[in-house]
């Protein structure tokens, strides 16, 4: 059960959904789901030194150079999407998916981002990351999760963080 006190762990969107569900009257049906944590996202990036490669690419980036920004963003997104999940994270996601799908092979799901810095008073990160609907099966869920993680490094998001003075490492996805 997620609540607004979980924003740092699961981001604003997931915490808000959890809060809303907890406040609904009995009998109101809401689709169930699960969330990975910001810690899991950071573990994914740390696995096999990916975060160091990302930081090295971002450290020398001039976000005013549109071509360089596009190249760096594409390169980082490709690295993230190619990164394997740590075994324990993949196992946890697979188990949560199995519970959620309850053996329904035809079930489809939404894979959505929830950033730890989405709804701040002086910055709005909402809408910068990807959402995927009608995702079918664990393999596609895992693939779309990587695409969601990679979307933290789309050109718009990279530039926005730089211009708002946020360190890239300070924003995580759930």
Per-segment meaning from a language model:
Residues 1-174:
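N-terminal beta-alpha lobe that positions the nucleotide/phosphoryl donor
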